[in-house]
Regions:
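C-terminal substrate-binding subdomain of Rossmann-fold SDR/epimerase-dehydratase oxidoreductases
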Residues: 203-205, 211-319
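NAD(P)H-binding glycine-rich loop region in Rossmannoid oxidoreductase-like domains
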Residues: 54-93
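Rossmann-fold cofactor-recognition segment
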Residues: 45-56
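NAD(P)-dependent short-chain dehydrogenase/reductase
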Residues: 154-209, 215-220
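Active-site helix of classical SDR
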Residues: 145
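N-terminal Rossmann NAD(P)H-binding glycine-rich loop of SDR-like oxidoreductase domains
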Residues: 3-25
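Short alpha-helical oligomerization interface
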Residues: 82-97, 130-138
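Conserved Rossmann-fold NAD(P)-dependent oxidoreductase catalytic core, especially the SDR/UDP-sugar
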Residues: 74, 99-141
Length: 337
């Protein structure tokens, strides 16, 4: 069990839920939740908040030494759609930030989780049952940073023995935080609009099929990977991971079962080309074999749970604009793609 855990990007989509779960599972372990901006949320004896820009290696080292950190969940990153609008920022945060974490892990003997993404795959990648080892050739700067990040992880593991572990995450669906500039944001935004307005304009075509995962499964996958014995980890770049794949139209149809008056129209934008370059179904058999990965939520279960949690939230007037009342909040930690 880790003595002190640092979570970068802790206010983001996955980071915020991961911090909660780490606090539950590892009672008594010091959790340091870091983000670029000071947080007003409640601290406790075992949970503290620190301001950290992951491109600042000196500040990172200060936090590691101050708390005696031995494990880092490195979730800070810039997403696909936002990355296309600011390529320099995307490269700086996603590459230099990761390199700083890996260097700290090398010198301080830390264990690291670093997420990758299905965005590492490109137009020449097999779209159906994409294998663990295959052509990548990403078409976005975000995907390029993630593919480069995988090579960095492999290098630090092979060259220096750093225990770094990674997952190629699909689109992540959750209700806890605002969307943050990803190509799969439609699969979250649609729930807010369905409940609050009864209609939604989707930015990908109806037949667009992408791999998705519900947040509880994503958190479980991350923690299960980190709990596995080192001898079980056969992939040192990043594991394929999957749960369910569905099209935008199939998601709409499932929501219709609960909200029959809901309507959806489709106006594809620049994100359509990004989605078209990604796989539709991922082969994650190696993760299931090596360390026992299995998902729990299918599409009907995801839709039911999302509506059950968001309906009372929106009834109180919270996040009526699909979470966009606080645009950009915690974007550095958002890794849903």
């Amino acid at each position: 069990v880790a003595k002190a855990i640092l979570v970068t990007g802790a206010t983001g989509q996955i980071g915020s839920d991961l911090v909660k779960e780490l606090s539950k599972r590892y009672e008594g372990t010091q959790i340091i939740a870091s983000s670029r901006k000071a947080q007003s949320s409640t601290e406790s004896e075992s949970l503290v908040h620190e301001v950290l820009d992951v491109t600042d290696s000196q500040r990172l080292q200060e936090i590691i030494e101050c708390y005696g950190v031995d494990t880092i969940y490195h979730l800070a990153g810039i997403l696909s759609a936002k990355g296309e609008r600011d390529r320099e920022l995307c490269w700086n945060v996603n590459i230099n930030g990761l390199k700083n974490v890996l260097e700290a892990a090398r010198t301080c003997h830390l264990k690291v989780f670093c997420p990758s993404s299905i965005a590492v795959f490109g137009a020449n990648t097999p779209k159906f049952k994409t294998p663990q080892t295959t052509i990548k050739e990403p078409s976005t700067i975000y995907g390029i940073t993630k593919a480069t990040g995988e090579l960095l992880c492999q290098y630090y593991a092979d060259r220096f023995g750093v225990d770094v572990r990674s997952l190629r995450l699909p689109g992540i669906i959750s209700y806890g935080t605002p969307t943050g500039g990803g190509t799969t944001d439609f699969a979250v935004e649609i729930f807010y609009r369905a409940i609050a307005e009864g209609s939604y304009t989707c930015f990908v075509r109806s037949e667009t099929r992408l791999p998705m995962m519900y947040m509880p499964d994503a958190i479980e996958a991350i923690l299960k990977l980190m709990q596995a014995e080192l001898s079980a980890i056969k992939v040192r770049s990043s594991y394929n991971i999957a749960a369910v794949s569905f099209s935008a139209a199939e998601l709409v149809a499932e929501i219709h079962k609960h909200l029959p008056n809901f309507t959806c129209n489709y106006q594809p934008d620049f994100r359509q080309a990004i989605a078209d370059s990604w796989p539709s179904v991922i082969d994650d058999s190696q993760a299931r074999t090596d360390w026992g990965w299995q998902h729990s939520y299918d599409l009907p279960a995801i839709v039911t749970d999302m509506l059950e949690h968001l309906s009372p939230k929106l009834a109180k007037g919270i996040n009526r604009q699909g979470g966009r009342e606080t645009p950009g909040a915690g974007e550095q930690g958002r890794i849903c793609i």
